[in-house]
């Protein structure tokens, strides 16, 4: 590649890895560059790499590495760095997601609304996110391929693998639903087990204090409907050797340190300080900074409780851990026999006895198991003694085996707690495994870990290669096999039999006398020429392997010890015979073959290899998805990016390997629109007229004589370096064009300045000459004229002085004479007028003052007395009327008592022929009747007393009227006194006297007013007493009803009642009917016959079945009428809903509102709900919104509460009291008097009003949600329109303003048409404007939310051209809002504030000059800093290539956002949808106009029903009060 001056490049630098530079001078074999560190560097061309400019990347960064023009190592590194500085922690590399640990909370990225945004979205359509990868795996598993998926999360310790795994599980739980029959989600259950797994599987390493020393594969299981049905945790590759051997400054597994710090529990297990145990004191690091071992111990125990491990098992687990620690302290010395061993001393014996006690096994058997082994032969069992080294190895093998079995038991129990679905056919597995490791000293553990990563990298390479080939196939391009570096040779080196490193290591471990020197020698001898294996210079036993991520040197000192892992039958027999069920359960009995070989060799590396093979088989059976976690710095600090560390991780994570695979094929790919838009300047003649983008792309490439390209269906594919050639040629053309334009422009500016200067000089010269000539002529003319002027002036001055002197003398004389005369006359007139004015004014002032005082005093006194008198008169009249009504009721009661006596006489006659045994009951009934008569007499006497009290009140009222007459007479007398006082001569004295008199009268009047107020209070007390007496009478009547009910039951039980099939009503029923109280029986809801009807029907004989059938038939007919009104569309008359009016009329006529118990309201609500559940419910929603709101307003305005809510003894002041208060004063909500009759409502009617209110809210919410669902696809099309149409219109795409997207205006027109159709539908159904206004407002709020969130989630939407496009669409919506007026649109335009301000920010020019305050206060006052920061980080100018906001403003906003995140002030930059109901019942009553239902005619379909014939006979039914 040739380099020219001014080219942007990358140059390698030791400290930073790569730095930005610009070519200053290009020579044949050397290039001089100027770096960003302000240094001139001379390097060879091979060490330079081309760099993308900010203009090329669109904002300085891309969200997918494949979009980089120059896909190379520094380009990937610095793209991640720029995005990390903007808190954009996720970046794609094709289908691979790179996640950089932010080391700070970013809650706005992980809330439920964000999960909803990524649900069902194609990968790459929104900004990179871990939710997108999780959704891609879920969609392919459940929707597209029906194949199990896997998500491989890798990275070094501290890169955020565990947190990423949690987020993936959280999203899968969100889209897959909750686990069956469990309140906790699978994600919660798995996370609850994390503290337990971390305690037993995590340890401190060199780089991380909490490093997972095992691989975890979480398998989320789904049923056929895509819902989560179970989960399982699979663990792989536990680092067992860490139990017995660690290096400084690392630690053993956390659980050992927690147990030693557990206080009393540690004493129970005879544990001491950490440093006293061999398995722990090999490292000097015992505690972790910021972690308390004792607190972590209790957290682990709580995790065991949550998982469901019993207290007994917990105790057994910790006893087993303590036993392992005690095992490590057992030391051996040579025994009496050769090659034998024994326990060293008493200390070792103490630990042995303690371990045996904790294992609950025999101590002697434990000693023999450690110091000897048994060999089964045909002749018998041979016991062989072990030397000290073999005994120690035997001890460590036992400790590792016990710990491994314990860890497997924990995982098994956790899986039982979570719950697995064995019938599940689809799974999504999430793999969290340790990443590639390369330390200063690398041992056997790093060898195994890197071997696993080599396997995973091979799987990763195959997947990346496969994805590349799939894209080539989908684009139908001609391609050949891509050559890329395969790591199969490394895998063969490690695992191939029989001469792989693992095989050689196992062979060396099988020989007791083998050492690491013999192992290294044999390895170098077998692989002396292998390209991947190297011998180190400074050590004969160390070796170096060239892994995919770089070279790693391993020290073989402890390879053999860590690899040996014998399966000893004696170990299993020892612990399986333990008296502890838990320990014996860990070791099942061995089969016969294993017993014969009691000391079977099993290497850690071989088992590691088998587990890895099983893992790879699982992964190969699934479709993989990759998440590479990156740790930006070793200090775990936010906003710190260490280039070298990240570069090393990119290499270890295989990201750069994926880049290399892409470079081997066609790494650069562009859509035809993007390619033409960028490189059309190379062949401008092809842009004349209409053209095909694909053919134009081909023409450009052929014109440039490029051969390494392929034309796909939608993209052009270019080999590495081809895009650089095109960019160089494009840059040359643009440079030449720029120079040509600059030359012409300079010529134009220079000529323009010269012409302007010449014209100015000529004008100045002419002006100067004219000025001189005019000045000379003026001097001469002025000199000649001056002589003549002087002559005439002197004469005129003298004459004028003489005339002025004469006139002045005459004028002074006449003025003095007149002045003296006028002054004299004025003085005389003023004295006279002053006298008159003073007298008149003094008199008038006191008269007015007196009249004002007198009139005000009298008016106030009279008005107040009249008001009090009228109020008292009304109260007395009301009390009198109530007493009269009560007396009338008592008279009626007496008449009814006579009727009852007549009835009893008739019953006695009929019972004369009955059995003598019934006579006793008749006597009892007579006594009851007599007692009732006595009570009625008492009630009558009480009524008489009330009448007497009424007469007393009437007398008091007359006294009050007399006082009012006296006050009026006093008023007349005061007026006469005022007239007499006006004629008094001495106004001052008379007014003073009168004022004192008036003050005395005022005092007297106040006293009389106080007396009147006391009397009124007494009257009010008497009224309250009367009210209490009425309440007592009401209670007595209730008791009478209860007693008569008992009497009726006894009478019905008599045999003679068969002859009385039509009996009169009971006393309580007749009394209720006489005073207008509704009956409490359900069958008497619609009519209330009088007692005379029953008496008249005594001679008749009606069958019992007919009498019971009539109300049921009438009830069924009424129910059918209501169903017909609800199910049929009765339409409207004069804008009034017919169905609502008919239903209300029927309910009024049937007295449903006055019933204490009825089911008709439930039938109405149920029928409406049934209609709304049908298939055509969406189309009928506006119709029923209009009807239900009209019915609700009729109820609100015409129902009022009765005594049920006003009597304190009946109801408390709770919710019903509030409802009653609302119904008592409907004018409070209406604001005007209603001509419609008011109906006293009972509790069912009040409940019906509440149900109807809920129904209106439900219909409104359902209609709103349906509209949102319908408009969402239209909005999505509008969002995608700029992306699909960009560049399709050739030169038109470069135009400015609204015309930038002429092809997309139809999408906005579709939204406008949708709104027009909605308005027509609502108006056709006469939906009140109040509902339309609320509905349109919430719909525009939804439009604002959708457009704004899309702007913040899609980088291609956050561009200059897209801002113009959205702005044009918003102008159409503004026009629509203006057309429909504020009556229906309301504040809809205000609801679009967020998207309007965001779009306004996108399309302004010179953004770099804007300060943060200007942006916050002027441009985007409604947006939060987090939202503005998100727009600034996503924005790029795709039209003019200008830069965005200045780096200083971005840095200030980033600091504010970070501070905001720490304080948890706001969690998201996205807007939430408002699902609330934006109105209340009071709002409806105030906003909806009154409805006159009188002129609504009965539809023909209902006229044949007898129950509604009243609607044909009368226009305005008056309900019975």
From Swiss-Prot:
High expression in kernels and stems, intermediate in ears and leaves, and low in roots, silks and tassels. ATP binds at residues 155-162, 208-216. Residues 870-910, 974-1050 form a coiled coil. GO terms for cellular component: actin cytoskeleton; cytoplasm; membrane; myosin complex. Residues 1162-1459 form the Dilute domain. Disruption phenotype: Dilated endoplasmic reticulum, small and misshapen protein bodies, and opaque endosperm. GO terms for biological process: actin filament organization; actin filament-based movement. Its main location: cytoplasm. Residues 493-527, 529-552, 587-612, 612-634 are annotated as: Actin-binding. Residues 60-731 form the Myosin motor domain. Keywords: Actin-binding, ATP-binding, Calmodulin-binding, Coiled coil, Cytoplasm, Motor protein, Myosin, Nucleotide-binding, Repeat. Residues 4-53 form the Myosin N-terminal SH3-like domain. Myosin XI motor protein required for endoplasmic reticulum motility and protein body formation. May function by binding with its tail domain to receptor proteins on membranes and exerting force with its N-terminal motor domain against actin filaments, thereby transporting its cargo along polarized actin cables. Belongs to the TRAFAC class myosin-kinesin ATPase superfamily. Myosin family. Plant myosin class XI subfamily. IQ domain mediates interaction with calmodulin. The tail domain is a globular cargo-binding domain. This is Protein OPAQUE1. It comes from Zea mays (Maize).
């Amino acid at each position: 590649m040739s380099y020219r001056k001014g080219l942007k490049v990358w140059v390698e630098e030791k400290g930073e890895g790569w730095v930005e530079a610009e070519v200053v001078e290009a020579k044949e074999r050397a290039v001089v560059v100027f770096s960003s560190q302000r240094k001139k560097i001379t390097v060879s061309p091979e060490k330079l790499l081309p760099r993308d400019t900010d203009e090329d990347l669109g904002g300085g960064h891309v969200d997918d590495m494949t979009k980089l023009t120059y896909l190379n190592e520094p380009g990937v590194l610095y793209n991640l760095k720029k995005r990390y500085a903007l808190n954009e922690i996720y970046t794609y590399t094709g289908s691979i997601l790179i996640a950089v640990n932010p080391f700070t909370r970013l809650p706005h990225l992980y809330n439920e609304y964000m999960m909803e945004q990524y649900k069902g979205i194609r990968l790459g359509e929104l900004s990179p996110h871990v939710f997108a990868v999780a959704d891609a795996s879920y969609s392919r598993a459940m929707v597209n391929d029906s194949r199990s998926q896997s998500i491989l999360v890798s990275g070094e310790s501290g890169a955020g693998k565990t947190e990423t795994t949690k987020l993936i599980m959280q999203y899968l739980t969100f889209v897959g639903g909750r686990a069956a029959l469990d309140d906790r989600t699978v994600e919660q259950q798995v996370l609850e087990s994390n503290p337990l797994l971390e305690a037993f599987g995590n340890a401190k390493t060199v780089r991380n204090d909490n490093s997972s020393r095992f691989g975890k594969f979480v398998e989320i299981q789904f049923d056929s409907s895509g819902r989560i049905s179970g989960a399982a945790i699979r663990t792989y590759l536990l680092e067992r050797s860490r139990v017995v051997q660690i290096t400084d400054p690392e630690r053993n597994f956390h659980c050992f340190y927690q147990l030693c710090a557990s206080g009393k529990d540690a004493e129970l297990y005879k544990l001491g300080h950490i440093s006293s145990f061999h398995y722990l004191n090999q490292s000097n690091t015992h505690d972790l900074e910021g972690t308390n071992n004792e607190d972590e111990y209790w957290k682990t125990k709580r995790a065991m409780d949550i998982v469901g491990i019993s207290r007994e098992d917990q105790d057994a687990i910790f006893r087993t851990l303590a036993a392992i620690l005690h095992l490590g302290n057992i030391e051996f010395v040579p025994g009496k026999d050769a090659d034998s061993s024994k326990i060293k001393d008493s200390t070792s014996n103490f630990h042995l006895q303690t371990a045996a006690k904790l294992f609950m096994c025999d101590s002697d058997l434990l000693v023999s198991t450690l110091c000897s082994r048994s060999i089964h032969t045909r002749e018998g069992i041979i016991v062989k003694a072990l030397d000290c080294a073999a005994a120690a190895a035997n001890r460590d093998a036992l400790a590792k085996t016990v710990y491994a079995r314990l860890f497997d038991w924990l995982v098994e129990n956790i899986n039982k707690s979570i719950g697995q679905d064995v019938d599940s056919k689809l799974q999504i597995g999430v793999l969290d495994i340790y990443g590639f490791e390369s330390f200063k000293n690398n041992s056997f553990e790093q060898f195994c870990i890197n071997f696993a990563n080599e396997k995973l990298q091979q799987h990763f390479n195959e997947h990346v290669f496969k994805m590349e080939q799939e894209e080539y196939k989908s684009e139908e391009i001609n391609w050949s096999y891509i050559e890329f570096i395969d790591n199969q040779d490394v895998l063969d080196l490690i695992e191939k039999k029989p001469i792989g490193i693992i095989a050689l290591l196992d062979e060396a471990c099988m020989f007791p006398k083998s050492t690491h020197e013999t192992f290294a020698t044999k390895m170098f001898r077998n692989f002396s020429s292998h390209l991947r294996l190297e011998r180190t210079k400074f050590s004969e036993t160390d070796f170096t392997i060239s892994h995919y991520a770089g070279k790693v040197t391993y020290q073989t000192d402890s390879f053999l010890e860590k690899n040996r892992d014998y399966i000893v039958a004696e170990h299993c027999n020892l612990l399986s015979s333990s008296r502890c069920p838990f320990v014996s359960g860990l070791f099942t009995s061995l089969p016969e073959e294993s017993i014969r070989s009691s000391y079977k060799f099993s290497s850690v590396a071989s088992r590691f290899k088998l587990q890895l093979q099983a893992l790879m088989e699982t992964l190969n059976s699934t479709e993989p998805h990759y998440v590479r976690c990156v740790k930006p710095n070793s200090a775990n600090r936010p906003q710190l990016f260490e280039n070298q560390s990240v570069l090393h991780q990119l290499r270890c994570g295989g990201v750069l390997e994926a880049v290399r695979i892409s470079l081997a094929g066609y790494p650069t790919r562009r859509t035809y629109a993007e390619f033409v838009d960028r490189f059309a300047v190379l062949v401008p003649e092809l842009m004349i007229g209409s053209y095909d983008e694909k053919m134009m792309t081909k023409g450009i490439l052929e014109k440039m004589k490029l051969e390494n390209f392929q034309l796909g269906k939608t993209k052009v594919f270019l080999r590495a370096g081809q895009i650089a050639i095109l960019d160089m040629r494009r840059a040359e053309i643009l440079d030449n064009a720029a120079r040509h334009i600059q030359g012409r422009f300079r010529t134009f500016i220079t000529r323009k300045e010269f012409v302007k200067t010449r014209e100015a000089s000529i004008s100045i010269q002419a002006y100067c000459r004219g000025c001189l000539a005019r000045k000379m002529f003026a001097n001469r003319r002025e000199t000649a004229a001056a002589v003549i002027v002087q002559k005439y002036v002197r004469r005129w001055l003298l004459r004028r002085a003489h005339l002025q002197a004469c006139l002045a003398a005459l004028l002074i004389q006449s003025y003095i004479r007149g002045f003296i005369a006028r002054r004299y006359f004025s003085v005389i007139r003023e004295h006279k007028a002053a006298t008159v004015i003073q007298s008149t004014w003094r008199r008038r002032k006191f008269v007015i003052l007196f009249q004002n005082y007198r009139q005000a005093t009298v008016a106030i006194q009279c008005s107040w007395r009249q008001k009090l008198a009228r109020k008292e008169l009304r109260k007395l009249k009301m009390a009198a009327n109530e007493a009269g009504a009560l007396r009338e009721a008592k008279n009626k009661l007496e008449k009814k008592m006579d009727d009852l006596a007549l009835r009893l006489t008739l019953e006695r006659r009929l019972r004369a022929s009955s059995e003598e045994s019934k006579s006793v009951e008749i006597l009892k009934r007579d006594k009851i009747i007599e007692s009732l008569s006595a009570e009625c007499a008492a009630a009558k006497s009480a009524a008489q007393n009330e009448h007497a009290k009424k007469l007393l009140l009437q007398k008091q009222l007359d006294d009050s009227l007399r006082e009012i007459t006296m006050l009026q007479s006093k008023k007349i007398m005061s007026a006469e006194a005022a007239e007499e006082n006006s004629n008094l001569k001495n106004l001052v004295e008379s007014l003073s006297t009168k004022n004192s008199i008036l003050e005395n009268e005022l005092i007297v009047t106040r006293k009389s007013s106080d007396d009147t107020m006391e009397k009124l209070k007494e009257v009010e007390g008497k009224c309250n007493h009367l009210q209490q007496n009425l309440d007592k009478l009401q209670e007595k009547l209730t008791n009478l009803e209860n007693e008569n009910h008992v009497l009726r039951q006894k009478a019905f039980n008599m045999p003679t009642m068969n002859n009385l099939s039509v009996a009169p009503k009971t006393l309580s029923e007749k009394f209720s009917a006489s005073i207008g109280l509704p009956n409490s029986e359900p069958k008497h809801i619609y009519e209330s016959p009088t007692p005379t009807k029953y008496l008249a029907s005594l001679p008749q004989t009606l069958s019992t079945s007919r009498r019971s059938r009539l109300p049921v038939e009438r009830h069924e007919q009424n129910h059918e009428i209501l169903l017909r009104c609800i199910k049929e569309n009765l339409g409207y008359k004069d804008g009034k809903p017919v169905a609502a009016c008919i239903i209300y009329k029927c309910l009024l006529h049937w007295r449903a509102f006055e019933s204490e118990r009825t089911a008709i309201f439930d039938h109405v609500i149920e029928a409406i709900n049934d209609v709304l559940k049908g298939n055509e419910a969406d189309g009928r929603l506006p119709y029923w919104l209009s009807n239900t709101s009209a019915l609700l307003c009729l109820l609100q305005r015409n129902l009022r509460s009765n005594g049920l809510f006003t009597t304190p003894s009946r109801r408390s002041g709770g919710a019903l009291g509030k409802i009653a208060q609302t119904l008592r004063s409907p004018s409070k909500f209406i604001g005007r008097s209603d001509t419609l009759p008011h109906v006293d409502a009972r509790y069912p009617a009040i409940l019906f009003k509440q149900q109807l209110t809920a129904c209106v809210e439900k219909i409104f919410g359902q209609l709103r949600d349906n509209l949102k669902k319908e408009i969402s696809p239209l909005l999505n099309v509008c969002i995608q329109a700029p992306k699909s149409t960009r560049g399709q219109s050739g030169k038109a795409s470069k135009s400015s303003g609204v015309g930038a997207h002429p092809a997309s205006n139809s999408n906005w027109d579709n939204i406008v048409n949708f709104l027009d159709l909605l308005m027509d539908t609502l108006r056709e159904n006469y939906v009140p404007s109040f509902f339309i206004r609320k509905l349109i407002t919430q719909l525009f709020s939804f439009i604002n939310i959708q457009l704004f969130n899309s702007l913040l989630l899609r980088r291609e939407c956050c561009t200059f051209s897209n801002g113009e496009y959205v702005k044009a669409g918003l102008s159409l919506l503004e026009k629509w809002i203006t057309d429909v007026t504020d009556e229906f649109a309301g504040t809809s335009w205000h609801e679009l504030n967020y998207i309007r301000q965001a779009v306004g920010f996108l399309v302004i020019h010179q953004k770099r000059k804007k300060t943060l305050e200007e942006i916050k206060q002027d441009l985007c006052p409604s947006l939060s800093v987090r939202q503005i920061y998100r727009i600034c980080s996503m924005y790029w100018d795709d039209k003019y290539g200008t830069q965005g906001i200045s780096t200083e403003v971005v840095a200030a906003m980033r600091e504010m956002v970070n501070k905001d995140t720490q304080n948890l002030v706001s969690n998201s930059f996205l807007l939430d949808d408002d699902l609330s109901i934006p109105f209340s019942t009071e709002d409806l009553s105030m906003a909806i106009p009154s409805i006159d239902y009188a002129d609504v005619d009965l539809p023909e379909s209902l006229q044949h029903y007898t129950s509604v014939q009243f609607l044909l006979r009368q226009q305005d039914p008056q309900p019975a009060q």
